Amino acid sequence: MKIRFLFFPLILASQFSVTATGPWGSGVPGSPEMLEFEAKWLPMASSPAKMRGHESFNQQKYGMFIHWGLYSQLGGVYKGKKLEEGGTGPRVAEWVMRRKEIPRAEYAKLADSFNPTRFNAEEWVEVAKAAGMKYMVITSKHHDGFALFDSDVSDFNVVDGSPFGRDIIRELEQACEKAGIAFGVYYSHSID
């Protein structure tokens, strides 16, 4: 399967902004951290491929970003406690494993019940197209490590590790191509 990835500068902007603050450095212009940051990331951000992606994204203007994975099953609630109650990390549902400090082995059991039998890629794409959307992006693998595609490097994926057994990313990519909508994926390198 050949997936065409789109560059979305807004996604990267949050991590690779003009200042490197927090765990990445002081953010002080001219500091050793900033000089290293600029040497590594600025050439990447201005490559011809990235510029073409940036131009394409600006022309498309309107699209859909789907954040979906094992965490979706919990709905922001773990053992009766809402995500907002205690824990560490961002207060958003896709961070439930970290925020509620769920042990990996316990969290991985969610794959046993991940079975979205009503998923229909063509219907999702039809809805996007009918709304005038020009692109669709989905989390192919979030920070929890569970892939929504058939991975050659891990069985912790929708095809090998869940009762659903279908490649969601492949189905969406094919439906987007058929409908003439650009397709992209968000892929987290965390837990690779």
Can you name each region flagged by the protein language model?
Residues 21-192:
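Mature catalytic domains of secreted/periplasmic carbohydrate-active enzymes
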Residues 3-13:
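Sec-dependent N-terminal signal peptides
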Residues 14, 19-20:
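Boundary at the C-terminal end of the N-terminal hydrophobic targeting segment
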